[in-house]
């Protein structure tokens, strides 16, 4: 399998820590994404490493028994360590605060602490087998204050730090889940819900395992992911992942079912809003995108893998230290190892090898694995880093080797412009709201974020259409059809078409002498009026004489003042066109000779300069009976230049009758 075929990879720079062994225990904190390596209960050192930490945190603590759980509060201000089932110990890591440990026992009598979660830099939740206790930690007083508690029988729990939701498993079958949400000193109880267990014979006792539940945010919404090893319907083989949507308000609802079509050991990650399911037996993974169209049965949507199953890209463990200098080759990493542990959303840890990786999606290989261009675009436009790949797909579908049909090209352009229009509308609404003084509204207005899915006209023009038009091998009819298809799509979404796209169409038509088509496009307003377009038409007069009149008509429709038209033409170095225009409206006796001679000089075309100079000499002769310029016209430098280039004898002599 070529390297271009893998669409999942482990990050290049993993967090490296001391491998787990009888002396060294390894813990992972899902909130701070930190790995703790605790040697000899902390007596010979604790090393804490996170993905963004340039400098690991190292410290020692007294060995007061086996460490069951160890985590820093957010911002690494307070360390919490659980050594017994009854209490949690705390130690301040704040400058000028006492570093003496202080302890908090759980309030409920006879309860055992299953674990704890920090929800902020000074708020912590104890989860016991009899409920939860929410505390505020006061580091300066070295004590805790109980904010709220709730009694409920708990089998196990899981925590989603991104949304600050704790899920408690209750009842004998362990499948009734009770969520709690934490925010700024408050604890809210959300409606409990039941996870449907697979159908099973009466003799077997099925219960919900903590291993088969994950919580993750997908497309901004919180979901509970349940790995159901056997489908509820007996005629269906293989496992499935059931997604329950957990809203901030209202009941949890089953929304999606991801069909795995295989059985065995699975693990789940969420990367870039994609659900990744790893299968240990085949050492492959598949990805699901719940935004892509699935099969809806009236209640839930069924999804199949977006792509064929593939292994994560082979990974070599980089050598460090003196060994890296020798000829020793890097060691291939054992992928899908039984020692791998996955954490949400995108973390894979190998405790036996001492590595923490972030899982990543590679978009470029997917282009060749998903032949349906419409579905490919739907998929790519939802990804964070999609712009370069989206533009490469557009270029590829216009290339000779992979040329797509016009309906497919139209579909792709429509999908791009749908996202583009969504952003333009949101941005306009925001601007109008700010201008109307609603910027201090509650909740405060947020400027829409321009994601990489917003591919605008300049992106398509620069990266796709310009190179495409320059390819001389392309049939010109196809080129024009593609350009018009993009303009059609922009018009359909009511996006004003930029003049440079119209210019590209006109230049292509002129290049292939398709003047009749150009005339039709202008006549039926397929190409929108604009000043740059009118100037371009004027410059085409020598190839296509009617272009002059078409241009003037356009400028008049735009209500452009005559002197402004002249300025526009001169700025575009269309000196002759400007002169023809001014003669056409009878204003040539009053124009500034110097302005036209300046413009002619700037073109570096001496014959053009000669023509313009001669025109004004003739005008002077006609109006004043003398070809020479008057001092008031300030043309001395141009007369000197004319003499220098053409000689004094080339100047007109006054005509006498």
Swiss-Prot record:
Primary localisation category: membrane
InterPro entries linked to this entry: RMC1, RMC1_C, RMC1_N, WD40/YVTN_repeat-like_dom_sf, WD40_repeat_dom_sf
A GO biological process held by the record: regulation of autophagy
Any Gene Ontology CC annotation: Mon1-Ccz1 complex
Subcellular location, record wording: Lysosome membrane; Late endosome membrane
Expression sites by tissue: Highly expressed in heart, brain, spleen, lung, liver, skeletal muscle, kidney and testis.
Keyword set, alphabetical order: Autophagy, Endosome, Lysosome, Membrane
Mic1 domain location: 471-637
Annotated function: Component of the CCZ1-MON1 RAB7A guanine exchange factor (GEF). Acts as a positive regulator of CCZ1-MON1A/B function necessary for endosomal/autophagic flux and efficient RAB7A localization.
Binding partners and assembly: Found in a complex with RMC1, CCZ1, MON1A and MON1B.
Similarity comment: family membership: Belongs to the RMC1 family.
Entry protein name: Regulator of MON1-CCZ1 complex
Native source organism of the sequence: Mus musculus
Gene coding for it: Rmc1
């Amino acid at each position: 399998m070529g390297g271009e075929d893998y669409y999942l990879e482990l990050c290049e720079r993993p967090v490296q820590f001391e491998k787990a062994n009888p002396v060294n225990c390894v813990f992972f904190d899902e909130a701070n994404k930190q790995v703790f390596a605790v040697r000899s209960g902390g007596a010979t050192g604790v090393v804490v490493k996170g993905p963004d930490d340039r400098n690991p945190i190292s410290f020692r603590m007294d060995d007061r028994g086996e460490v069951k759980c160890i985590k820093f509060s957010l911002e690494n201000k307070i360390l919490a360590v659980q050594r017994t089932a009854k209490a949690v110990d705390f130690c301040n890591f704040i400058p000028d605060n006492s570093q003496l440990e202080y302890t908090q026992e759980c309030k409920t009598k006879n309860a055992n602490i299953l674990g704890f979660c920090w929800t902020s830099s000074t708020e912590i939740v104890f989860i016991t087998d009899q409920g939860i206790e929410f505390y505020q930690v006061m580091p300066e007083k070295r004590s805790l204050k109980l904010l709220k508690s709730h009694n409920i029988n708990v089998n196990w729990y899981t925590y989603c730090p991104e949304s600050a939701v704790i899920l408690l498993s209750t009842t004998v079958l362990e499948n009734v889940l009770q969520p709690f949400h934490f925010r700024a000193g408050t604890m809210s109880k959300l409606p409990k819900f039941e996870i449907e267990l697979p159908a099973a014979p009466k003799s077997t006792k099925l219960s919900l395992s903590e291993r088969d539940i994950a919580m993750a945010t997908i497309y901004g919404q919180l979901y509970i992911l349940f790995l159901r090893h056997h489908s509820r319907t007996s005629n269906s083989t293989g496992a499935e992942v059931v997604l329950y949507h957990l809203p901030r308000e209202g009941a949890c609802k089953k929304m999606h079912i991801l069909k795995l079509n295989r059985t065995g050991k699975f693990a789940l990650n969420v990367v870039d809003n994609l659900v990744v399911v790893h299968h240990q037996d085949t050492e492959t993974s598949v990805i699901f995108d719940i935004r892509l169209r699935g099969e809806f049965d009236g209640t839930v949507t069924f999804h199949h893998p977006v792509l064929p199953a593939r292994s994560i890209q082979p990974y070599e463990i980089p050598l460090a230290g003196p060994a890296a200098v020798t000829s020793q080759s890097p060691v291939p990493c054992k992928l899908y190892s039984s020692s791998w542990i996955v954490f949400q959303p995108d973390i894979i840890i190998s405790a036996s090898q001492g590595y923490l990786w972030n899982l990543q999606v590679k978009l470029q290989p997917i282009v060749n694995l998903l032949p349906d261009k419409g579905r490919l675009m739907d998929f790519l436009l939802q990804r964070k880093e999609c712009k370069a790949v989206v533009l490469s797909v557009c270029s590829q579908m216009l290339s000779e080797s992979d040329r797509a049909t016009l309906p497919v090209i139209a579909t792709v352009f429509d999908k791009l412009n749908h996202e583009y229009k969504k952003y333009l509308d949101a941005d306009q609404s925001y601007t109008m709201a700010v201008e109307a003084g609603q910027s201090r509204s509650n909740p405060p207005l947020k400027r829409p974020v321009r994601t990489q899915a917003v591919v605008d006209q300049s992106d398509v023009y620069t990266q796709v259409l310009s190179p495409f038009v320059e390819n001389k091998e392309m049939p010109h009819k196809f080129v024009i059809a593609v350009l018009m298809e993009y303009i059609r799509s922009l018009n359909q979404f009511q996006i004003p078409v930029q003049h440079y796209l119209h210019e590209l169409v006109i230049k292509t038509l002129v290049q292939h002498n398709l003047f009749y088509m150009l005339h039709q496009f202008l006549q039926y307003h397929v190409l929108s009026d604009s000043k740059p377009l009118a100037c371009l038409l004027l410059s085409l007069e020598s190839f296509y004489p009617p272009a002059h009149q078409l241009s003037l008509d356009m400028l008049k429709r735009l209500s452009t003042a005559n002197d402004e038209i002249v300025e526009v033409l001169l700025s575009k170095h269309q000196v002759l066109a400007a002169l023809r225009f001014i003669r056409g409206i009878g204003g040539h006796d009053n124009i500034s000779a110097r302005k036209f001679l300046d413009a002619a000089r700037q073109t570096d075309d001496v014959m053009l300069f000669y023509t313009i100079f001669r025109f004004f000499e003739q005008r002077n002769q006609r109006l004043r009976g003398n070809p020479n310029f008057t001092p008031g016209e300030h043309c001395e430098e141009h007369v000197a230049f004319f003499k220098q280039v053409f000689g004094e004898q080339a100047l007109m002599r006054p005509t006498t009758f």
